[in-house]
């Protein structure tokens, strides 16, 4: 990648001619995906991470609201608990009230014009520098805070808070700079030029607990495109989110461009949707919350200066469909990882598995054998842990309720796991359930925990089962088909065309990579704007087309009139 000081010069050249601005796109920004480090015994990255984890042990960080350069504390104090040791308060923070949120809006709006007028390459430099900081000196810090605060293992923190977040910052910068090269044709005696402006107003970014990278991207992508942002981080990802915010500021992000404002959900939603200056909501979270925000925007539509843009990713009930021609080893390995990594707390996690009767004895035996080897525990103390506790008491209670339902339902049988213990942390044993009814609620509703439900279908009913896969739930996020028969793969791909925004063939339903598999789904899963791809940034720009004519216009009358 080019050195940062020369980035702007190498990307764009411009010159003024009269009142018109001419742009010539001279090159593109070359980036690659951030390598995932191994953290093997004795490696520098492992030593650095273990030191960072040791520094966090028993510690609590005080995290204020930040408006501009001012750190603000309110009387509404909250705490973030470590999921695997809820006696450990990892962060103390406060909720912004309505007055502070409105103050943040005003300060952001005052900074908007200058930020929007900065050349794209200058804004990109901020995020490229932040990516370099995350890749190098700040990597261990953000990984450790993600592990301790959100209960991630080493590898899950690495692919999230390091690799994916770095990729978001670098690839978004690449896409944004290259977008400026997308210009309309010019026909003499006129020239045409597109200016990619930020939206008029402020963007509200509402981020989830399960990916540090998503929080950085929800706030960062609109800011890159010239917008000002109010960022409401998740209460249960506060420690890592604040670290990302501080890194952006240290990388050169000016004050008031991203306001860091933890807040109660309803207070934040009510405040931003009642402001005439709201121009967008960038959201990841639950379907009910996104629907509520959408309704609030609709109810206030006459108030806004512009139509707000709503981008949302809302989860899924993701599937693995197995055909009788499938490779069993791939099915077992892919399903265990997809269903149970990070305790099933990924929007893309597999939670329903469809298996042909002919393969079920073999797949069942292998699943149960491998299930017995899964280690659940403290990821900071034991790097051999496969996954840790679920995020908080609310999640624990929700998952436990589903497991109680599984024990009482006549159509469900628990094959393995399902024990729950919240004495130290919010631990749920990975659970495999068999359902005799493909329409059982546990096959339809998102659980967001380490629960996999299997439906065994007759081999000759695979087409009917594919229809079940498509129609059983309201979601459409991710899914996978396992089959070696190419004709079956083609047929399944056609039949499941609308069932998944990210569709996998002989691979697990999780693990999308920025720049390779832009992520998102439709139906109840969201607006499918595909963060991680080149089109996502278009949601956060309002293009202006400028035409300049270089000769006098002449007579107002057309020639045929004379």
UniProtKB/Swiss-Prot annotation:
Binding of substrate, residues: 512
Species this protein is from: Mus musculus
Residues that bear N6-acetyllysine: 51, 92, 98, 113, 129, 174, 317, 357, 364, 375, 461, 508, 530, 551
EC number in record: 1.2.1.88
N6-succinyllysine: residues carrying this PTM: 30, 92, 98, 113, 129, 174, 346, 357, 394, 508
Gene Ontology annotations for the cellular component aspect, listed alphabetically: cytosol; mitochondrial matrix; mitochondrion
Transit peptide (first-last residue): 1-23
PANTHER family per the UniProt record, alphabetical: 1-PYRROLINE-5-CARBOXYLATE DEHYDROGENASE FAMILY MEMBER, DELTA-1-PYRROLINE-5-CARBOXYLATE DEHYDROGENASE, MITOCHONDRIAL
Pathway(s) of this molecule: Amino-acid degradation; L-proline degradation into L-glutamate; L-glutamate from L-proline: step 2/2
Uppermost EC category: oxidoreductase
GO MF annotations in UniProt: 1-pyrroline-5-carboxylate dehydrogenase activity; aldehyde dehydrogenase (NAD+) activity; identical protein binding
Residue numbers of Phosphoserine PTMs: 43
Active site: 313 (proton acceptor), 347 (nucleophile)
Classification via PROSITE patterns: ALDEHYDE_DEHYDR_CYS, ALDEHYDE_DEHYDR_GLU
Keywords associated with the record: Acetylation, Mitochondrion, NAD, Oxidoreductase, Phosphoprotein, Proline metabolism, Transit peptide
Residues flagged as site, Transition state stabilizer: 210
Subunit structure as annotated in this protein's UniProt entry: Homodimer.
Posttranslational modification: Acetylation of Lys-98, Lys-113 and Lys-401 is observed in liver mitochondria from fasted mice but not from fed mice.
Function: Irreversible conversion of delta-1-pyrroline-5-carboxylate (P5C), derived either from proline or ornithine, to glutamate. This is a necessary step in the pathway interconnecting the urea and tricarboxylic acid cycles. The preferred substrate is glutamic gamma-semialdehyde, other substrates include succinic, glutaric and adipic semialdehydes.
Protein's name in the database: Delta-1-pyrroline-5-carboxylate dehydrogenase, mitochondrial
Localization: Mitochondrion matrix
Residues given in the record as NAD(+) binding sites: 207, 232, 285-289, 446
Single biological process term from Gene Ontology: proline catabolic process to glutamate
């Amino acid at each position: 990648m080019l050195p940062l000081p020369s980035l702007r010069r190498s990307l764009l050249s411009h010159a003024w001619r009269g009142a018109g601005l001419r742009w010539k796109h001279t090159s593109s920004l070359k980036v690659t995906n951030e390598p995932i480090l191994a953290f093997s015994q004795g490696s520098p990255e492992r030593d650095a991470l273990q030191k960072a984890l040791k520094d966090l042990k028993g510690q609590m960080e005080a995290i204020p609201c930040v408006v501009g350069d001012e750190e603000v504390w309110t009387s509404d104090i909250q705490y973030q608990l470590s999921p695997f040791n809820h006696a450990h308060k990892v962060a103390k923070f406060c909720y912004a009230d309505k007055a502070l949120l409105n103050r943040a809006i005003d300060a952001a709006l005052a900074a908007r014009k200058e930020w929007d007028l900065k050349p794209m390459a200058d804004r990109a430099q901020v995020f490229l520098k932040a990516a370099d900081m995350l890749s190098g000196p700040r990597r261990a810090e953000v990984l450790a805070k993600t592990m301790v605060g959100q209960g991630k293992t080493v590898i899950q923190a690495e692919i999230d808070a390091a690799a994916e977040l770095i990729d978001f910052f670098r690839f978004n910068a690449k896409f944004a700079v290259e977008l400026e090269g997308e210009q309309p044709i010019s026909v003499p005696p006129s020239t045409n030029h597109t200016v990619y402006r930020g939206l008029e107003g402020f963007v509200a970014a509402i981020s989830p607990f399960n990916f540090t990278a998503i929080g950085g991207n929800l706030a960062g992508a609109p800011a890159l495109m010239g917008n000002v942002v109010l960022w409401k981080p998740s209460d249960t990802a506060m420690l890592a989110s604040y670290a990302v915010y501080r890194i952006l500021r240290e990388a050169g992000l000016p004050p008031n461009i991203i306001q860091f404002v933890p807040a109660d959900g309803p207070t934040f939603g009510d405040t931003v949707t009642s402001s005439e200056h709201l121009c967008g909501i960038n959201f990841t979270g639950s379907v009910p919350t996104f629907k509520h925000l959408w309704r609030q925007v609709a109810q206030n539509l006459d108030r806004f200066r512009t139509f707000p843009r709503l981008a949302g990713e809302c989860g899924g009930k993701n599937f693995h469909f197995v055909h009788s021609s499938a490779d069993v080893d791939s099915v077992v390995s892919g399903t265990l990882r997809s269903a149970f990594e990070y305790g099933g707390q990924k929007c893309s996690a597999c939670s329903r598995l469809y298996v042909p009767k002919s393969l079920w004895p073999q797949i069942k035996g292998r699943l149960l054998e491998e299930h017995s080897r899964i280690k659940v525990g403290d990821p900071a103390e034991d790097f051999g842990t496969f996954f840790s506790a679920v995020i908080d008491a609310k999640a624990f209670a929700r998952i436990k309720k589903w497991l109680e339902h599984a024990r009482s339902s006549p159509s469900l049988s628990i094959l393995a796991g399902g024990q729950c213990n919240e004495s130290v942390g919010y631990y749920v044993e990975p659970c495999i359930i068999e359902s005799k009814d493909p329409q059982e609620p546990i096959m339809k509703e998102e659980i967001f925990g380490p629960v996999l439900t299997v439906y065994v279908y007759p081999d000759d009913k695979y087409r009917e089962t594919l229809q079940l896969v498509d129609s059983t739930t309201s979601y459409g996020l991710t899914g996978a088909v396992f089959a070696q028969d190419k004709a079956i793969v083609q047929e399944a791909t056609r039949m499941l065309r609308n069932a998944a925004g990210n569709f996998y063939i002989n691979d697990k339903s999780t693990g999308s990579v920025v720049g390779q598999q832009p992520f998102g789904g439709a139906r109840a899963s969201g607006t499918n704007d595909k963060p991680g791809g080149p089109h996502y940034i278009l949601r956060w720009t309002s293009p202006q087309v400028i035409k300049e004519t270089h000769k006098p216009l002449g007579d107002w009358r057309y020639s045929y009139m004379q």
